Amino acid sequence: MKQYKSVLLFALVVVLITACGPKATETPVFQGNNPYAPQTGDSNLMIGDLTIDSSSVFLAKSQPPQVMVNFAYFQPTPCYQLRVEVSGPDTDKHINLKAYAVAEKDKPCALMALATPLQASLNLGSFPSGHYFVMLNGNQIGEFDS
């Protein structure tokens, strides 16, 4: 009987200690669809800058609402491929997108830059309740309430 009381007392102490601990916070993780995610061999490629022509952020009418980002961009030449790194939200509720282009280092490209911008669309997924800011290459392109 004494052993039973000891086990019960120990279990009660453990429950009380865990109940008094910090509340678990919901940490959003990117769970959207990024067809432009960095690839494993990108470290061997040459990186080029993009010029963003236009951008938009909107919520898709779904349950839960999905955050969508569209942007038009110019890349150095058609030989480059788009990459977009998605991070956040950070403590200030900024969702950061870093867009750039990659191309093979030792392969010359004789093609001229395109005169019309290319289009890209990303589904960032859904987020916990709050007010968020979407940043693309350091510039705010939109905000939304979730």
Task: Tell me what each language-model feature is.
Residues 21-23:
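Bacterial signal peptide processing site
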Residues 98-126:
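An anionic, turn-rich surface loop/hairpin at beta-sheet edges
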Residues 1-8:
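Bacterial N-terminal signal peptides that target proteins for export
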Residues 103-108, 138-144:
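Short acidic/polar inter-strand loop motif in beta-rich domains
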Residues 26-65, 81-83:
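Beta-strand/beta-sandwich contexts
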Residues 16-19:
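C-terminal motif of bacterial Sec signal peptides marking the signal peptidase cleavage site
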Residues 61-106:
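Mature extracytoplasmic domains of secretory-pathway proteins
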Residues 130-136:
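A short tyrosine-centered beta-strand micro-motif
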